[in-house]
């Protein structure tokens, strides 16, 4: 039986419009893991593992808490606490793993499917800010936000301080294309009616195979360290452009 877990490879683009323009695009890859497949997804892969140290590994404490219960249970509890309804279908996460003992995820997405595994019912977005390393999760009810088949849109107010170069007075417009042969996530930040910032992740699906896993370790030998270095490099560029700095509220 073909696994639902896979690798997504593509590009991440950030575009700041105000108060001054800053734009960049980087190649990226993410793991897309079905939580029911965690026990065997890396079977036979020497450099990849779940629950034990390795070059690349999944470690429970890197993700949504409380971390003393299974991640799948924590996500179902989080959705139920927000909507009063418990998801019963598969849960698949889009994330970075731990590489060479280090993990940092600006955002991980948990896609909660219906019992028949035909559509996404909820998306949990777990965000980690920089440099404080605090976490916050938004729970998005997909059933009420279907724009058209396989497209989901959410608009909501910012509730978590993410970057010192943006204050809290924003609202978000997020657009998701349900994961398939391709995956797309588009996020826009508005202040009143002005578009300040947008980010887009566009990727293509690849099967988890020895060749693909070797390729990503060669092409991105320390993915999460690369993510952090990108964040701080772009922060330096914003500082040079005299973008206002906002203290943590």
Model-assigned labels for residue ranges:
Residues 1-249:
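Mature, function-bearing regions of proteins
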């Amino acid at each position: 039986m073909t696994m639902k877990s896979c690798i997504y490879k593509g590009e991440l683009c950030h575009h700041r419009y105000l108060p001054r323009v800053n734009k960049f695009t980087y190649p990226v890859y993410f793991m897309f893991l079905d939580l029911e497949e965690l026990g065997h997804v890396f079977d036979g892969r020497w450099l990849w593992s779940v629950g034990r140290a390795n070059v690349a590994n999944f470690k429970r404490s890197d993700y949504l808490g409380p971390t003393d219960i299974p991640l799948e249970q924590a996500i179902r509890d989080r959705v139920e606490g927000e909507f009063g309804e418990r998801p019963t279908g598969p849960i698949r996460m889009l994330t970075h793993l731990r590489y060479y003992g280090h993990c940092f995820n600006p955002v991980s997405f948990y896609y909660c499917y219906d019992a028949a595994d035909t559509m996404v019912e909820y998306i949990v977005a777990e965000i980690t800010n920089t440099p404080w390393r605090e976490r916050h999760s938004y729970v998005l009810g997909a059933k009420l936000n279907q724009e058209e088949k396989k497209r989901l849109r959410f608009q909501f107010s910012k509730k978590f301080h993410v970057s010192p170069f943006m204050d809290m007075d924003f609202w978000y417009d997020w657009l998701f294309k349900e994961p398939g042969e391709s995956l797309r996530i588009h996020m826009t930040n508005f202040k009143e009616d002005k578009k300040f910032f947008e980010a887009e992740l566009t990727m293509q699906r690849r099967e988890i195979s020895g060749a693909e896993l070797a390729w990503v370790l060669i092409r991105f030998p320390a993915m999460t360290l690369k993510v952090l270095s990108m964040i701080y490099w772009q922060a330096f560029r914003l500082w040079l452009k005299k973008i206002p700095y906002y203290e943590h509220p």
